[in-house]
């Protein structure tokens, strides 16, 4: 007996699973607010130098730029030199008295003057946030395999709630960055644990649907953020508003059961049995749950129990050729997705469209994108869906290179299409990665994969600097990288209707089966029924 068959006995898709996914999904909905928060809390309004205290604003104080508007970072020296014939020869100086911002909304930019020579600090804040997610993926992936999925999830909720609230009350920019780093750290733990718990408690046939449902939670969160930002013009109150709900999620997470597979592999079979019986009662299958015994559980999952004695680290991801190839291809796909996604998602201001409207459009494109992803994952398979998403995104980004800047509508359409494809790529990757890695090292594999997408999201803003050399260079780099990631996905094995691998040895058997001609259809059908046939694919979860 496998876990999938045990799950069938206690209810593989009952009330418990729907409530379980709902409890995991609500935090994901609000997590989108944190990921994209800096679009609004770090918005840069039109600004110019504040005139000296003894001068009035005017063209004789503020030089005009090429666009006929006041220079943003320079002003004329005051008082003017009377011997100069006209203002064109007057000396200019930096904004010694600060700036005037033409906006009724405040942000970290207006509060700490992150403009002109300090404008790089704005990007640094986002990079620090992404660094927190990156480090969190490294640290929490291993801790989750050691101490369980639920404890890491619960602590991550509390960390995000506390650090997000702390950022709202930060007195200085350095302290704000520290709290943003901790926010990223917490988000990484939430993402990793949610993915694992979703996949391990949902039957195979429903994995794609339930995982994509979690993806929709993130999508709807993107709809909520523009409304919140419009209604709450003060960045501190906006930061606090999106952080407080995680205190509630921290409390509700105590209801979330631990992964049964993890409990068995950790030698806690008695606790696993209690949870299975509670799930059976919740799903209206109390008698089936009562018939399960500790001896039966240990006997039928003896293989998994014996694996608890083995210790696995990130180095084991490179132990066998197939695992090495998988890790390389997945790492490239994750890097390319994060690299290209955040180039579009955080570049909303570049398209000359109303910030709030464009953010809603960017979020809205995820709805059809994820629906198409569900169908594609279920019928075309994982590696085809993954490759197509990245290849199409790369093509759309490269096309931006050839569209003139004044054709803003065309550029916006291409960007929205590319963003939708990359969102689809994320949804597929979470599911695909969790299905490819064996149970004994799944969370570590997810952690390493998330590391690469965060590296991509950190490097992405730096590539924009190359636009100062030639405007088309950034999009060429983003587009080619996405194409490479899509090509790498073609070398990954298909997992549609395949059992979740429990051990590294299972992957070797996978490889051997793939090389053999289909001689024994009856045996193959039986093997497919073992862990997964009861159920199907999912999102970006475990």
Swiss-Prot record:
pH-dependent activity: Optimum pH is 6 for estrone 3-sulfate uptake and uptake is higher at acidic than at alkaline extracellular pH.
Entry keyword annotation includes ATP-binding: no
Primary localization class, coarse: membrane
Pfam families, sorted: Sugar_tr
Compositional bias ranges of the Basic and acidic residues kind: 517-527
Side of membrane Cytoplasmic, spans: 1-9, 145-154, 198-212, 258-327, 376-386, 433-471
Catalytic activity line of the entry: estrone 3-sulfate(out) + glutarate(in) = estrone 3-sulfate(in) + glutarate(out); estrone 3-sulfate(in) + 2-oxoglutarate(out) = estrone 3-sulfate(out) + 2-oxoglutarate(in); glutarate(in) + 2-oxoglutarate(out) = glutarate(out) + 2-oxoglutarate(in); urate(in) + 2-oxoglutarate(out) = urate(out) + 2-oxoglutarate(in)
Protein known as: Organic anion transporter 3
The encoding gene: SLC22A8
């Amino acid at each position: 007996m496998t876990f999938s068959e045990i799950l069938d006995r206690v209810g593989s898709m009952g009330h418990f699973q729907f409530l379980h996914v709902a409890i995991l999904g609500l935090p994901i909905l609000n997590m989108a607010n944190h990921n994209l928060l800096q679009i609004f809390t770090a918005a840069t309004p039109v600004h110019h130098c504040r005139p000296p205290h003894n001068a009035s604003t005017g063209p004789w104080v503020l030089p005009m730029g090429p666009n006929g508007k006041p220079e943003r970072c320079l002003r004329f020296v005051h008082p003017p030199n009377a011997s100069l014939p006209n203002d064109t020869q007057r000396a200019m100086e930096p904004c010694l008295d600060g700036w005037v911002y033409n906006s009724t909304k405040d942000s970290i930019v207006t509060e700490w003057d992150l403009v002109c020579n300090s404008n790089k600090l704005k990007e640094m804040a986002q990079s620090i946030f992404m660094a927190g997610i990156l480090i969190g993926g490294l640290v929490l992936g291993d801790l989750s395999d050691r101490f369980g999925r639920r404890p890491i999830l619960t602590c991550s909720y509390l960390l995000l709630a506390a650090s997000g609230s702390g950022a709202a009350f930060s007195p200085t920019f350095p302290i704000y960055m520290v709290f943003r780093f901790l926010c990223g750290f917490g988000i990484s733990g939430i993402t990793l644990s949610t993915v694992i718990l979703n996949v391990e408690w949902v039957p195979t046939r429903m994995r794609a649907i339930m995982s994509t449902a979690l993806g929709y939670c993130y999508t709807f969160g993107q709809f909520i953020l523009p409304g919140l930002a419009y209604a709450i013009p003060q960045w501190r109150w906006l930061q606090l508003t999106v952080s407080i709900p995680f205190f509630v999620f921290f409390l509700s997470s105590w209801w979330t059961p631990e992964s049964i597979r993890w409990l068995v592999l950790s030698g806690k079979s008695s606790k696993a049995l209690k949870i299975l019986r509670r799930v059976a009662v919740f799903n209206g299958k109390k008698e089936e749950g009562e018939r399960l015994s500790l001896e039966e559980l240990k006997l039928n999952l003896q293989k998994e129990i014996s694996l608890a004695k083995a210790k696995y680290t990130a180095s084991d991801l490179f132990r066998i050729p197939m695992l090495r190839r998988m890790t390389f291809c997945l790492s490239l796909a994750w890097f390319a997705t994060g690299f290209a996604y955040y180039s579009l998602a955080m570049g909303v201001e570049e398209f000359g469209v109303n910030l709030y409207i464009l953010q809603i459009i960017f979020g809205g494109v995820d709805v059809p994108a994820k629906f198409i992803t569900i169908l594609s994952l279920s019928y075309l398979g994982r590696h085809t869906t993954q490759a197509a998403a990245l290849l199409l995104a790369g093509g759309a980004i490269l096309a931006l290179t050839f569209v003139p800047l004044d054709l803003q509508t065309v550029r916006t359409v291409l960007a929205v299409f590319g963003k939708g494809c990359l969102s689809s790529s994320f949804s597929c990757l979470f599911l695909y990665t969790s299905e490819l890695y064996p149970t004994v090292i799944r969370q570590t594999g997810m952690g390493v994969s998330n590391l690469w997408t965060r590296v991509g999201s950190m490097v992405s803003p730096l590539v924009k600097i190359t636009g100062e050399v030639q405007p088309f260079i950034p999009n060429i780099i983003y587009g080619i990288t996405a194409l490479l990631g899509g090509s790498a996905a073609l070398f990954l094995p298909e997992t549609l209707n395949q059992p979740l691998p429990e051990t590294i040895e299972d992957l070797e058997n996978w490889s051997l089966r793939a090389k053999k001609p289909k001689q024994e259809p009856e045996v193959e059908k039986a093997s497919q029924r073992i862990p997964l046939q009861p159920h199907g694919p999912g999102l970006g979860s475990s």
